[in-house]
Amino acid sequence: MISATNEHQELSTLWGQSLQPVHCLNCKVAHLIPGNLESTHCPACFSGRLERQPSVIRREPPELMVNFTISPEQVEMHFKDWVKGIWFRPKELDPNLLSRRVNRAFIPLWLVDGKITGTWQAQMGYDYEVASSQEAYQNGTWRTRKVTETRIRWEARTGTIERRYQNLVVPALEEHAWLITGLGKYKLNLATSYSPLQMDNASIRVPSLLPESAWPLAKSKFDQYSAKDCQMAAEAQHVDEFIIQAAYEDQNWTQLLLPMYTTAYRDEDGIVHTILINGQNGNIFGKKLASQRKARILSLGLLGTALLCFIFGLLFAVGTKFLPILGLLSLTSFILALLVGISAPMPAIWAWNFNRSQD
């Protein structure tokens, strides 16, 4: 068994900085956090407490990283744009407060190297042109127009392949597709060699999709690249029904880190909502909810105003017996009561519909 001290030393050697493995008691997500970081709150859910996790830590090293290009100051500007149009915001859904709570974090991808050796068969498609004539009746006469059509000639091909591929990108988190859908794609071509100097107290998500589980995705990538290489070797323009029987050897798994900010706010019911920000392009991913309580208070206020106008209208109507000019005030009060009464439920309805659109 590896002791916690030895594991801590191994992590420090692997990552070039002092790190400690932790996991969240609430969301069960595992992280590597800087040894000097005193926060006990989970950077993933902001609800759970972090506890040390001295074992079951992946030892695949970091190889590449995409650096942060969005500063915390720019994050606040992105938040200001993000919350525009929300009329009734919860107290904590404030750009300044959200930006002050941001944590730097990195999410992992697998980089897979390996050698593929085997045999393949496929239908290779070759473009060729067919010339024909097309008759058209124009301006009282028949005209002939030449038409060139591109068609595909399919040929069965077989062969062998022996290739080595490097840095095939494979998800390392079970929720990777969900995260990228919300955060937007990263420009992986801007990745640089891993440097602990660029981490700056950032937490690191521990892969939840282990190499054994991620292998089918990696194998698919190997096969895709093999199909492209076989297509190029056959000088074909198209490939279909590609089947390969191969051995996948000399595999090496490392990590590519993607930058992300995390923050959170509590809604009026005390529920914590985590907000994620793409550290490269500033895309914001999370729920922005309106305060239904504030909306209901405004609706009740408008309803009370409408009722008050109606009461004044009645009083003015009674007063017309003594002062006819009060009839005009009575009519005005009734019209105001009607207009305000119609608009009274609008704030509550808007907040309800807005929150439904965030699901």
Q: What function would you assign to each model-found segment?
A:
Residues M1-L14, L32:
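N-terminal cysteine/histidine-rich coordination modules
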Residues C24-C27, C42-C45:
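Short cysteine-rich clusters marking metal-coordination/redox-active sites
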Residues T40-P43, I57:
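Conserved glycine-bearing catalytic or ligand-binding loops at nucleotide- and phosphate-handling centers
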Residues I33-P34, E51-R52:
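Short, non-ligating residues that shape and space the ligands of small metal-coordination modules
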Residues Q17-P21, S39:
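Residues immediately within or flanking Cys/His clusters that coordinate Zn2+
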Residues E10-L11, A30, L97-V102:
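Catalytic micro-motifs at enzyme active sites that drive phosphoryl/nucleotidyl and oxygen chemistry
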Residues G270-S291:
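Juxtamembrane amphipathic/hinge helix adjacent to a transmembrane helix
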Residues G16, R58-I271, A290-I297, T305, ...:
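Charged, low-complexity helical/coil segments in non-catalytic cytosolic or luminal regions
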